[in-house]
Swiss-Prot record:
Responsible for the transport of dicarboxylates such as succinate, fumarate, and malate from the periplasm across the membrane. This is C4-dicarboxylate transport protein. It comes from Rhizobium johnstonii (strain DSM 114642 / LMG 32736 / 3841). Belongs to the dicarboxylate/amino acid:cation symporter (DAACS) (TC 2.A.23) family. Keywords: Cell inner membrane, Cell membrane, Membrane, Symport, Transmembrane, Transmembrane helix, Transport. Coiled coil: none annotated. One of its GO terms (molecular function) is fumarate transmembrane transporter activity.
Amino acid sequence: MIAAPLDAVADSKGKKPFYTHLYVQVLAAIAAGILLGHFYPEFGTQLKPLGDAFIKLVKMIIAPVIFLTVATGIAGMSDLQKVGRVAGKAMLYFLTFSTLALIIGLIVANVVQPGAGMNIDPASLDPAAVAGYAAKAHEQSIVGFLTNIIPTTIVGAFADGDILQVLFFSVLFGIALAMVGEKSEPVVNFLNALTAPVFKLVAILMKAAPIGAFGAMAFTIGKYGVGSIANLAMLIGTFYITSLLFVLVVLGAVARYNGFSIVALLRYIKEELLLVLGTSSSEAALPGLMNKMEKAGCKRSVVGLVIPTGYSFNLDGTNIYMTLAALFIAQATGIQLSWGDQILLLLVAMLSSKGAAGITGAGFITLAATLSVVPSVPVAGMALILGIDRFMSECRALTNLVGNAVATIVVARWENELDTAQLAAALGGQTGEMAPAGGLQPAE
């Protein structure tokens, strides 16, 4: 009589109540934050420290996660030329799809024309509203961005939490470990042993995700209000629909060609997506995404190189936003851009977008950098979208995250560093017929 109930209890142990899942908690927190911010806006704006504190907690652990993942991954490579190949293929992928995202934003803006008919006089715009963003944009330069990748000190790179500086040192340190050979085994073993508690710490910190998402969303709705969305609903709707189609159609086609389902991938990283939705920062999900991609069958060396690099060089959502928003401003202020002007805008955006970090508001600063170089579109026109940029930030961050997840799997497969059986198991068996490895085109 006792055995049956005990068996039933044992079977039920494998299934956690739905409310204990992180994604359910984050989703509920986002909904609660929206309601609180709408009905009690003053109180909602006071909850901003909750979101800021959570993002700081995550940033605290990003540098150790990148260092351990990259250094141990490269140290375990028998062929150091693979490091160059992985980096080269990743940059080729980033350049291709980042440019495609910019072009799609340009095409959609010309077809839909979300700013047409607003007839705003550029002289009536207040340049002081965006002066801070413009100043930050002028501080950016291609040469400065590239030289800034090299840290002044190793400690400084980790203390500042600069992703590219930490990645730069981690790659060099991993190569040094691999070149030393057997003598470096104690160091490699120590770093491998350190990886487990660091990722356990990530899991512990993620328990606070619902609190962070609640505070960030309550602040956003409380400060900007739902009403600010309605004023520029055409632009917001166009951007969200374009980004969704980019993920489902463009990235979906890439995923299908490389043997997996984009829908299954979205389901697999749903906790990271909801975390980004709540905080508007794709950086908040970086440690979790790296862990998930490794569990999905991508070798650690590929994950460690592709994802951190992608956070500066593979921002599909930010790229769609940049060309779409630039043309919206031109249309709203009655400025007719020739195809030559639009091509110039595209070329400038291709360069300026490469320095955008995965933090809240980086897309707006990058847009300012682009417009400051293109004389046809007034930088002051950014004041038109300043109030709604926070609502578009979520979509940018979500699209960026999915783009980097797809890129990791594709590059891993190109390098034959992908365990397809493990990927199928992680995605719930939702994989398709695998195209030939080596690139986007079938091997001849």
